Amino acid sequence: MNSRITLALESAPTAIKALLSDIVLADNFDATLSPEQFASLLQASGLADDELRIALLPFAAAYSYAPLSDFYVGAIVRGLSGTLYFGANLEIAGAQLGQTVHAEQSAISHAWMKGEQGISDITINFSPCGHCRQFMNELTTAKELKVQLPQRDEMSLQEYLPDSFGPADLGVTTGLMTKLDHKHTTEETTPIVVEALAALNRSHAPYTKNLSGVSLQLTSGEVFTGAYAENAAFNPSLPPLQVALIQLKLAGFDFEQIENAALVEIAEGSISHLADTQSTLEAINPDIPVTYLAI
């Protein structure tokens, strides 16, 4: 059990402590809250919508993996379906800092990989850094997205990022989280490669055309996938490995359980994720084999 979940329960509002315990300690809890669960918590707590989301932030931050900074950040996004998705910052000891994932990126990619096509709002412990503001500006819902911080009035993303630069400035009309199927195929039948290819076909890479996907197989048999999330400003792009690692951590698993990995990408893309994927996985465990396929 995640001990920080237990600590979050201890400090949760008394009126919803029992209900929250039933939800977050359930064996099938996947770091999400359904619209019905959130409505029940609203009714039981007597809190306003934004107040409840802020009260839930410690549960999102409980998923933080921060061996470098010991700085735990949580984020909660609400998908267009009404489901709430937790996210938290992720750091990789031994890898360069550019491999770090911010809490906002974590929650957004969590929602994306679970099928959401946009988010309506995001709630965060701390004011989003410029990197994350730019990352969020790539979203399908960037123009309407609302940002909620503790003890602050809700503001729009565009208020946090005035005169913003985004996909439209580069002639791109499809934002991150657009439902896509690039329909690439391969004759390779290895399950972990097939899973990585499925992630590739969902990826957002309009600038380099390097559609790519990663899959991670655990010793217990579970497989987690990540699709590449490219950004108009380039540097805030989120590699497919990091997206997969986020899904793994939010499902309650550890890096030590990774047994195999696969990266599939487009051969004619103008960049490659191979070197960074290999070096980052080597920082986690140099014995993880990586299957690579360029199609």
Swiss-Prot record:
Entry keyword set: Hydrolase, Metal-binding, Zinc
Binding site for Zn(2+): H102, C129, C132
Family of this protein: Belongs to the cytidine and deoxycytidylate deaminase family.
GO BP term, example: cytidine deamination
Cofactor(s) the protein requires to work: Zn(2+)
InterPro entries: APOBEC/CMP_deaminase_Zn-bd, CMP_dCMP_dom, Cyd/dCyd_deaminase_Zn-bd, Cyt/Deoxycyt_deaminase, Cyt_deam_dimer, Cytidine_deaminase-like, Cytidine_deaminase_bacteria
Domain CMP/dCMP-type deaminase: residue ranges: 48-168, 187-295
Protein name, UniProt field: Cytidine deaminase
Molecular function (Gene Ontology), one example: cytidine deaminase activity
Entry's EC annotation: 3.5.4.5
Annotated residues for binding of substrate: N89, L90, E91
Reactions the enzyme catalyzes: cytidine + H2O + H(+) = uridine + NH4(+); 2'-deoxycytidine + H2O + H(+) = 2'-deoxyuridine + NH4(+)
One cellular component term from this protein's GO annotations in UniProt: cytosol
Catalytic center residues: E104
Gene name tied to this protein: cdd
